[in-house]
């Protein structure tokens, strides 16, 4: 299944991140400093597949297929990595060495866009279409996955917002192919 094989990333190459030394980036770093570092919240939403599986269980989605999230993560990863390498934005911890963060294995790639935000919103939208009665809970999980990356200080707000846009665009692409 290659749902994103022909996904056009060119519009997302044009959506540049804020300049590293600019006002917006400094403002975003200051915003990160104000967010309490909550490791249990970060851990709860770091594993995207587990977060959606828990939401499905909590909302009694009987026919939930956990392989859907795994497939969407696998399919979206190469697209996300291309954009991360293209934009090559440093992580907040790289621009502000005094910024405490919750170091995770997933923080090895450039910052923009947030891959967790992309995948959270892609999966949230896909599952919401499949399970419309649980849409509110599924999209809340997507939002928490995205926000957890800022709580960990792994991403700037603009990384998360770009990730959310990209995830929604990927979902629309997949839906239009059906």
For each predicted feature, which ranges?
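Hydrophobic alpha-helical bundle signature of multipass membrane enzymes
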Residues: 1-152
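Interfacial helix-loop-helix junctions of multi-pass membrane proteins
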Residues: 144-175
């Amino acid at each position: 299944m290659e749902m994103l094989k022909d996904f056009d990333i060119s519009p997302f190459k044009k959506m540049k991140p804020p300049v590293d030394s600019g006002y917006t980036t400094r403002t975003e770093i200051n915003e990160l400093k104000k967010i309490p570092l909550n490791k249990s919240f970060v851990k709860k939403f770091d594993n995207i597949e587990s977060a959606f599986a828990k939401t499905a269980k909590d909302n009694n989605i009987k026919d939930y297929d956990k392989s859907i999230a795994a497939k969407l993560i696998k399919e979206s990863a190469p697209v996300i990595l291309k954009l991360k390498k293209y934009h090559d934005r440093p992580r907040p911890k790289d621009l502000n060495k005094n910024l405490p963060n919750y170091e995770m294995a997933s923080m090895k790639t450039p910052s923009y866009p947030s891959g967790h935000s992309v995948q959270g919103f892609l999966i949230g939208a896909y599952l919401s279409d499949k399970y419309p009665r649980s849409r509110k809970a599924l999209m809340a999980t997507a939002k928490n996955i995205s926000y957890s990356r800022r709580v960990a200080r792994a991403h700037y707000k603009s990384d998360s917002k770009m990730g959310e846009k990209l995830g929604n665009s990927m979902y629309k692409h997949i839906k239009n192919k059906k």
